[in-house]
C-alpha cells in the first residue's frame, strides 16, 4: 500500500468516526434482578476454576490478562469499597466482575442502573477468551452476589446486558436472575435518553411480573 493510499484510508476512517458520532444510536438492554430471598443456582465448577474476592493482596493478579489502565481502574473500585471477584483458571486470573455499592450519594451504573441503600449493581464483567465456555461467568455472578448479600444490607442486585448478547443473557438467567424489563436507550453526542425507568425494589410481600 502506498503512502497516499494509507493517508486516504486514514482520512476515510476519521470521517466515518466523525459521521458515526453524529448519528443517534439506539440500544436495547435487558435489565435483570435477584433479591436477597431468592435462590441462586451455582453451576458445576471444574477443579481448575477458583473464585476469590478482590483484595489489596491479589489486586495485581489481573495484570495476567488485562492492561495497566484496567488495573488502575480496579484500584479505584477497591478504594471506594466496591466488591469484586476474580476467576482463576489453571492458577491464572482469567475473569473479573464487580458490584457497585451505595456510599451515601446518588450513583448510576452505565448511566441508567440505580445504586442506593437497598440496591447494588453488578458491572464490568469479563472473561479471558481462552477460558470462556467453562461457566466461569456464571460462577463469578453467583459468588459475587453471595458476597454482596452476606456483607451488605442490600435487598436487590441488578445487572444488565445488551438484548442481543445471547451468551450473557442466558448465563444471567441460568444462575437465578429474572428479567425486570427491556430498557431502550438513545445515545447521541454524549447524551443519553432513557425510555423507561428501573422500578424500585419490591417489598417482601409483592411480586414484580416478568416483562
Which positions does each model-derived feature cover?
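Conserved active-site alpha-helix within GNAT-family acetyltransferase domains
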Residues: 163-181
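Extracellular-facing segments of soluble proteins and assemblies that are Gly/Ser/Thr-biased and enriched
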Residues: 64-92
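Conserved acetyl-CoA-binding loop-helix of GNAT-fold acetyltransferases
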Residues: 124-129, 133-148, 170-174
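Acidic, metal-coordinating catalytic segment for phosphate/diphosphate chemistry
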Residues: 200, 207
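Acyl-donor-binding surface of acyltransferase catalytic domains
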Residues: 1-74
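Conserved GNAT acetyl-CoA-binding A-motif
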Residues: 148-161
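Conserved catalytic-core motifs of GNAT/GCN5-like acyltransferases
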Residues: 32-33, 178-192
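Conserved acyl-donor/pantetheine-binding loop and adjacent beta-alpha core of acyl/acetyltransferases
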Residues: 80-81, 88-120, 124
Amino acid at each position: 500500500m502506498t503512502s497516499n493510499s494509507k493517508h486516504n484510508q486514514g482520512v476515510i476512517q476519521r470521517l466515518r468516526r466523525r459521521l458515526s458520532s453524529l448519528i443517534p444510536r439506539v440500544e436495547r438492554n435487558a435489565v435483570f434482578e435477584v433479591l436477597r430471598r431468592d435462590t441462586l443456582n451455582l453451576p458445576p465448577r471444574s477443579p481448575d476454576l477458583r473464585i476469590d474476592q478482590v483484595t489489596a493482596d491479589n489486586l495485581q493478579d489481573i495484570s495476567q490478562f488485562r492492561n495497566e489502565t484496567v488495573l488502575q481502574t480496579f484500584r479505584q473500585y477497591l478504594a471506594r469499597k466496591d466488591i469484586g471477584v476474580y476467576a482463576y483458571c489453571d492458577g491464572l486470573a482469567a475473569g473479573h466482575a464487580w458490584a457497585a455499592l451505595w456510599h451515601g450519594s446518588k450513583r448510576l451504573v452505565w448511566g441508567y442502573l440505580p445504586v442506593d441503600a437497598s440496591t447494588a449493581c453488578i458491572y464490568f464483567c469479563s472473561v479471558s477468551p481462552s477460558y470462556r465456555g467453562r461457566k466461569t461467568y456464571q460462577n463469578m455472578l453467583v459468588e459475587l452476589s453471595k458476597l454482596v448479600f452476606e456483607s451488605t444490607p442490600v435487598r436487590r442486585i441488578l445487572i444488565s446486558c445488551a438484548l442481543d448478547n445471547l451468551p450473557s443473557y442466558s448465563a444471567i438467567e441460568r444462575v437465578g436472575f429474572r428479567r425486570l424489563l427491556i430498557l431502550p436507550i438513545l445515545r447521541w453526542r454524549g447524551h443519553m435518553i432513557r425510555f423507561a425507568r428501573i422500578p424500585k425494589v419490591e417489598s417482601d410481600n409483592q411480586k414484580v411480573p416478568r416483562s
